[in-house]
């Protein structure tokens, strides 16, 4: 299972090194996994896939919008997938209309920054922006407004339904906390 987000500082490349340094308890006993900086969840989902003796996982992140995404994946996956499919359809429909495609992106960014939509739409906007912005960066200004420009992807995969379902199946095992 791959992360559903692109994330600067993601730990995917470190998994082999992390595995080499795991304590024996993780390999042979029951344990709780605590992820202090969940980000894309690369290590979290690797742990969930490879260590059936893990009794639970606790995820944390200072980014409350990111934690909202994980909560929605666990609690309302069908609504999230439906909204993401709608965003993807509309965005891909603008494939040969670059000016309109950019306008759509910036409208969604403005909607995200207003933070006055319901939590499912806010989570879908977070994922949409992550998949369509420049290099998948997450950057906010002092006003906590997401300010990354549109990326140059032709047809980004905004809704990976199968991967989202796999994440949803594991998300129930993870209490979510924001520092």
Tell me what each language-model feature is.
Residues 177-179:
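Short loop/edge segments at beta-strand edges and connector loops
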Residues 1-32, 37-38, 42-43:
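S-adenosyl-L-methionine
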Residues 45, 50-173:
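Class I S-adenosyl-L-methionine-dependent methyltransferase module
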